[in-house]
C-alpha cells in the first residue's frame, strides 16, 4: 500500500527516482514494472504497479467499443498507458506526451493513493490540496452516505 506525499525531481532526461521506501515492494511484488497513464479528472498522472494495472485492464476489457463514452474512456486510459520498469537506481522514464499532459517540470509530487500513485506538478498539487480542503470544509460530511460513518 502506498501512502504519503514525496517531493521529487524530474531530471533532464525525463526520469524520476521512486523514493527508496517504495522500491522494494515494487520490485518484489511487481518485478519493478509500473504502468503510467493519465488521470481523466485532473491534470496529473497515475502510476499503477503492474498487477494493479492488470485489474484496471480487465475492467476496461468489459467496456463497450460501440458506446461513445465507454470507448472514449478506453481510448484515453489505454492510449496514454505506458509500461516502464525501475532501473538499477530506482528511476523510471516519463514519456514526453505524459509529461506534457500533466505539465510536469522539475519539481514534482508523488502522492500515494493506496494501490497507485498520483504524479503532480508541485504547484498544481498545492492548488489541488487547497481545493480539496475547501470542498471538505464546505460539505456536511454526514450527509454523504459513504462518509457518514467515517471518523478519525
UniProtKB/Swiss-Prot annotation:
Provide the alphabetized UniProt keywords.
Cytoplasm, DNA-binding, Repeat, Transcription, Transcription regulation
Location in the cell: Cytoplasm, Nucleoid
Which residue range or ranges hold the SpoVT-AbrB domain? 5-52, 81-124
Q: Cross-referenced SUPFAM superfamilies, in alphabetical order?
A: AbrB/MazE/MraZ-like (SSF89447)
- Where is it mainly found? cytoplasm
- What family does the database annotate? Belongs to the MraZ family.
HAMAP family attached here? MraZ
Question: Subunit structure, per the record?
Answer: Forms oligomers.
Q: What is this protein called?
A: Transcriptional regulator MraZ
